[in-house]
Amino acid sequence: MDFLHRNGVLIIQHLQKDYRAYYTFLNFMSNVGDPRNIFFIYFPLCFQFNQTVGTKMIWVAVIGDWLNLIFKWILFGHRPYWWVQETQIYPNHSSPCLEQFPTTCETGPGSPSGHAMGASCVWYVMVTAALSHTVCGMDKFSITLHRLTWSFLWSVFWLIQISVCISRVFIATHFPHQVILGVIGGMLVAEAFEHTPGIQTASLGTYLKTNLFLFLFAVGFYLLLRVLNIDLLWSVPIAKKWCANPDWIHIDTTPFAGLVRNLGVLFGLGFAINSEMFLLSCRGGNNYTLSFRLLCALTSLTILQLYHFLQIPTHEEHLFYVLSFCKSASIPLTVVAFIPYSVHMLMKQSGKKSQ
C-alpha cells in the first residue's frame, strides 16, 4: 500500500500546485458528489418526474453508502492529509506538505471514496433510466439518434465522475485508488438494482425489515470487532490530530452519522410510499400532468433547502444521531407524501372554483 500512497501523494501535490486556480470548480464538483445532495437535490427532482427512478435512487444510494461503510471498516484506508504525518517512509521527518481545505478533514476511513461511490450510483441510475426511456417506441429512423444520445449521456457520466474524483484527490481527502474503487463500487451497486424490480412494490414491512437488518448488521459487525480489540473508530482521533483547523472537523462525517442518515431516509421512504397521503395524490387526475410535477419538484427543492437552516446540536453525540435520523426520515415524507398531497388538494380546490 505504501507504493499507492506515496505515488498518490505525488499526484495530489501536482494537482494542488498546477491546478490551484481551479479550486472553485473542483470544490463545486466535490459538492456534486456529496451523498447528502442525493436526498436534497437528485431524489426530489427524479421522484416527482418518475417515481420508479426516484425510488430506485434511494435504494441504490442507501445500500451503496451502507456497503461503503462496511468496506471502509474492513479496508482501514488512510486519508492523505493524515497519512503523510503518520507514515515512517519519509526519511528525516521530511513529510510532503499537502494543503488542506474546509472540506478536507473527514473523519472516517478513506477507502473506498463515499463521494465517488455516491456520484457513480445516482448518475448511473439516471443515465440508464434516460436511455431506457429513449428505447421505448424506437424505430429504425431513431436508432442513430439513440446511439448519439447513448454516447452523449455516458460521456457526461464519465466527465462528472472524473471531475468528482479529481476534486476529492485535490483536497487531499482521498488517494487516487480510493476514488477509483468508489466509482466501480457505485456502478456495481446501481447495476445490481437494475435487476431488482421488487423494490418498486415493497411493503412497509419490507422497508422496516431492511432497515433493521442494515442497522443490526452494522452495529453487530462493529461490536464483534470491538470484542476482537479492533477499534473501528480509529480514524476519528487521527483526523482531529492532523486537521489544520479544528473548525473543519464535523460530526456528520463520522461513520455512524452516515449510517443513521441513510437509515432515516429509507425509513421515511417506506412510510411515505405506503401513506394515505401519497395514495390519494396518486389517484388524483392531476398526478400525471406536467404542471403538477413541475410544481411538486420546485416546491420540494425549495422546502428541502430550508432544511439546511435546521442546525442539529452536536454537543451530545447520541442526541445528534436521534435528531439526524428524524431529520433524514422527514425528507422523503415531505417529497413523497406531504408536498404531492398538498399540491393535489390545492389544484383540486382551484379546479372546483373555476367550474
From Swiss-Prot:
| Molecular function (Gene Ontology), one example | glucose-6-phosphatase activity
Please state where this protein is localized. Endoplasmic reticulum membrane
Q: In which tissues is it expressed?
A: Specifically expressed in pancreas and also detected to a lower extent in testis. Expressed by most islet cells in the pancreas (at protein level).
Q: Provide the membrane-side ranges marked Lumenal in the record.
A: 1-24, 78-115, 168, 233-261, 315-318
Task: List the ranges annotated as motif Prevents secretion from ER.
Answer: 352-355
Stretches that traverse the bilayer? 25-45, 57-77, 116-136, 147-167, 169-189, 212-232, 262-282, 294-314, 319-339
Q: Which GO terms describe its cellular component?
A: endoplasmic reticulum membrane; membrane
What family does the entry list?
Belongs to the glucose-6-phosphatase family.
Know the name of this protein? Glucose-6-phosphatase 2
Per the UniProt entry, what species is this protein from, by scientific name?
Answer: Homo sapiens (Human)
- The gene for this chain is G6PC2
